[in-house]
Amino acid sequence: MAANIIKELEREEAQRLLAARAIPEFEPGDTLRVNVRIKEGERERVQAYEGVCIARSGGGVHESFTVRKISFGEGVERLFPLLSPSIESIEVKRRGVVRRAKLYYLRDRRGKSARIAERSNVRKVEVADAE
C-alpha cells in the first residue's frame, strides 16, 4: 500500500513539473543543445552544452539523459536529470537514425565512424503536427 502512495505522489509531481516547462520529444541519437544555469559565487549564467543524446534512463521524476560531445579532441559526457531546475531549456538540433536505445558504442569510435545519419522523415511529422 505504501509503495502505491509513493508511486502516485511521484507521478503527480512529474506531471506538475512537465506542465510547468516545455520539454521537447527526443530520443537517443538526436543532437541536443541543453542550456544549463551555472552558479559561480554570486553570479549566475547560462551555458549551452551541445552534443548527441546517447541514453535516456529512469522514469517519472527520476528520468535522466546522457549527452556526449567532443571537446578539444576529448569525449565529454554529461548526465542531466530531465526535470532538473538547473536546466533552462532543451533544443533538438538534429534528429538521428539509430537502432539502439543506448549508444555507448560511440565511446569507442572517432571521426566519421562516430557519425549518426539524420532522420529524413522529420518534415512529414512537423507538417502533420501543424494540421
Swiss-Prot record:
GO terms for biological process: translation. The keyword Ribonucleoprotein applies. GO terms for molecular function: structural constituent of ribosome. Keywords: Ribonucleoprotein, Ribosomal protein. InterPro entries: Ribosomal_bL19 (IPR001857), Ribosomal_bL19_CS (IPR018257), Ribosomal_bL19_sf (IPR038657), Translation_prot_SH3-like_sf (IPR008991). SUPFAM superfamilies: Translation proteins SH3-like domain (SSF50104). The keyword Flavoprotein does not apply. GO terms for cellular component: cytosolic large ribosomal subunit. NCBIfam families: rplS_bact (TIGR01024). Belongs to the bacterial ribosomal protein bL19 family. This protein is located at the 30S-50S ribosomal subunit interface and may play a role in the structure and function of the aminoacyl-tRNA binding site. PANTHER family: LARGE RIBOSOMAL SUBUNIT PROTEIN BL19M, RIBOSOMAL PROTEIN L19. This is Large ribosomal subunit protein bL19.
